[in-house]
Amino acid sequence: MKRIIVILLCITLVGGMVMTAHADESTLDFFKGLNFDDGLSVVVEVFQRFPLQYGTTLGLDGHPQIRPIEFKFEEDGVLYFDTVTFYTSYRELQAHPYIQLCVCDQETMTYVRLSGKVNFTTDQSIIDRCFEASPVLTSQFGNHRDVVIGYYLTEVWAEFASFSDELPNKSWKLLNKYDIAE
């Protein structure tokens, strides 16, 4: 049921998606050029091309909550994001540390979903990288870095799905160094 809600919200919100400029390459060509044998690279490249993702958390009221979020960076197979300590989403993720992200392309009828367990970090080098990766974060919280907290995902599962006959449907379990250490 929760997966259906996320997919429906993803499809509903696709009109509001922001895409970075790639005038020399169609979106279909971009997708065709992905290395589908490497799920991590698919996720990273899609999230970089479509910098605004929609993330779903389990709300404090027990209902799904969806909001725009921004992938920050990948390092050594680990996907990093951030939030702000006074946001409701931070409290939700503390109470229920799982998130699902979705980004969609209406033109090719293609989407990427990613889910995983949220692990917070106060490592200043990670938070600094989040600021480096995001002009929005810097403009909003550059003078208040103390309220920003980083997080990375473990137990990551990703799916690339398309209604286009020219693209595959694939899913991956993306283990990283923190999964292996557990």
What are these regions (language model features)?
Residues 1-4:
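Positively charged n-region of N-terminal signal peptides that target proteins for export
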Residues 9-17:
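Hydrophobic core
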Residues 17-25:
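Sec-dependent signal peptide cleavage junction
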Residues 24-35, 113-182:
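Charged, gly/pro-rich active-site loop segments
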Residues 24-54:
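Active-site-proximal "nucleotidyltransferase
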Residues 45-60, 99-103:
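A short, Trp-centered hydrophobic/proline-enriched beta-strand micro-motif
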Residues 54, 79-80, 159:
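General beta-strand recognition
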Residues 72-109:
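A short mixed-secondary-structure module that forms the rim of ligand-binding clefts
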